[in-house]
Design a protein with these regions (language model features):
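Bacterial Sec-dependent N-terminal signal peptides
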Residues: 1-29
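Short, conserved catalytic-motif segment at the N-terminal edge
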Residues: 30-88, 109-111, 193, 250, ...
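Residue-level preference for non-acidic, small/hydrophobic
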Residues: 41, 55, 61, 93, ...
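Short, P/G- and charge-enriched loop/turn segments at secondary-structure junctions
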Residues: 42-44, 85, 326, 355-361, ...
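Short active-site loop at a secondary-structure junction
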Residues: 43-54, 76-136, 199-212, 285-288
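Structural recognition of the beta-strand scaffold that forms the well-ordered cores
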Residues: 54-56, 135-137, 246, 371-372, ...
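Short, surface-exposed loop or secondary-structure junction motifs
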Residues: 128-358
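Structured C-terminal helix/loop/strand segments within mature extracytoplasmic catalytic/sensor domains
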Residues: 363-416
Length: 416
């Protein structure tokens, strides 16, 4: 009977293992992608690529993942939730500036072959007088990439120039740059003069420049007579479900901090824009300044998804979307669309991922933000981090190729 007992135990044990395997087999198909994403993001957090993240992935009409990971900072105090906001950095260039231009192109016949000096007469007497919308949007204008205006707000001894910027708000110094810095709004004239005088080199060649995007809020106001932010809210953001997209969020507790800035603002940048040039516009700019959650970006980019297209519910025409999101200069190795980023043209080492089609498009942001849409497989993905916390020196997000690995997981899932 001892023998029978042992056999019985072995049989029961084997049966249990079998049943566990059968039931796991079924869930593993559903949870495989979740499991892989969880382990990629959690291991990235433990390697300190970023303290936390949000991931939103949709195929066709099905949301595969809408999840938050980790914490606002490495001290693990505030957990990231789905309704928390990230500083989207250069995603602003497409999710605010470019979609506004797409609408102006439709509603006000904005001609992309026109020189931008048509709308900004101050550029007529400059080296930028012939630069067209097509050139600035495809980053082939030859304009200087970026100007560090904030370096010029300091004296040689490192102190701030009190004629321009102060630590207390007053009637003259009323533009809020950060918690403790207030700028004279008249300084904007200087900023635009500096952009006007900046160099132009090799137009026609690819060089990413953010400078034109500072003109977009002014352009929107000129053409629509509405403030940039109001136009975006009325035209796009207010139509979105669980919308959290906007500039200068009022409730900091839901906002993920970015960098400990020890050069210019001397504080942890939290709730105000990380990009220094955008901060000089009070965070309302065309190059950066938008905050939002991955799920609200997921909702917004539905307007750019050309599959299952129903013209009654869409804010942009299919032809407009195609025009802005296809390669702007097809017979070259330049990879940009108009405003949008696109995959590099070589297939082997294709950036941001080898599986993406030529029709796909998206954008990245300096703070560690990313979205990409591929109409060929009906994929939209949003991946937000604050990799610049506590310092922009942290390049692990790029070195460990985390965005591409995330896309690999999605495409593997599609193949299965």
């Amino acid at each position: 009977s001892f023998m029978f007992c042992q056999l019985n135990k072995i049989f029961t044990f084997t049966f249990v293992i079998l049943m566990v395997n059968i039931s796991c087999g079924q869930t593993s198909l559903n949870n495989n992608i979740d499991f892989k994403i969880d382990s990629l993001i959690n291991s990235s957090i433990s390697q300190k690529a970023f303290p936390g993240a949000q991931v939103y992935i949709k195929i066709g009409e099905e949301i595969l993942t809408n999840k938050s990971f980790g914490y606002h900072t490495y001290d693990s105090i505030v957990k990231v939730e789905n309704n928390h906001f990230y500083d989207l950095a250069s995603l602003t260039k497409v999710l605010a500036s470019t979609i506004a231009l797409m609408k102006l192109y439709e509603d006000f016949d904005l001609d992309l072959n026109d020189p931008i000096s048509k709308y900004f007469p101050e550029l007529k007497k400059s080296n930028k007088k012939n630069t067209t919308f097509n050139e600035v949007l495809s980053h082939t204008s030859g304009w200087t990439p970026y100007i560090n205006h904030h370096y010029l707000l300091k004296r040689k001894n490192g102190k701030l120039k009190r004629s321009i910027i102060r630590n207390k708000k007053s009637k003259r110094f009323n533009l809020k740059v950060s918690k403790n810095l207030f700028l004279r709004e008249s300084y904007h004239k200087k900023i635009f003069k500096r952009i006007k005088k900046s160099e132009v080199n090799n137009p026609g060649e690819y060089l990413y420049s953010g400078l034109f995007f500072f003109y977009i809020p002014r352009l929107v106001e000129k053409i629509t007579s509405q403030k940039y932010e109001d136009y975006l809210n009325a035209t796009f953001y207010k139509n979105i479900k669980n919308n959290s997209l906007g500039f200068n969020p009022s409730d900091y507790s839901n906002v993920v901090p970015t960098e400990q800035d020890n050069f210019f603002r001397n504080t942890l940048v939290h709730g105000s824009v990380h990009d220094e040039a955008a901060s000089l516009f009070g965070g309302r700019s065309g190059n950066a300044g938008l905050f939002g959650s991955a799920q609200s970006i997921g909702e917004l980019i539905k307007i750019l998804e050309t599959w299952d297209f129903n013209n009654s519910n869409t804010l942009l025409k299919k032809s407009t979307i195609t025009k802005f999101t296809e390669y702007a200069i097809p017979d070259s190795n330049i990879r940009r669309g108009l405003g949008f980023d696109k995959p590099t043209k070589e297939i082997e080492e294709r950036y941001p991922n080898k599986n993406l089609s030529d029709q796909s498009f998206g954008h990245t942001g300096f703070t560690g933000t990313f979205f990409w849409t591929d109409p060929k497989v009906k994929l939209s993905m949003v991946f937000l981090t604050n990799r610049v916390y506590p310092s922009r020196e942290n390049q692990k997000l790029y070195k460990k190729n985390i965005r591409s690995k995330l896309l690999d997981i999605v495409f593997e899932n599609l193949k299965n």
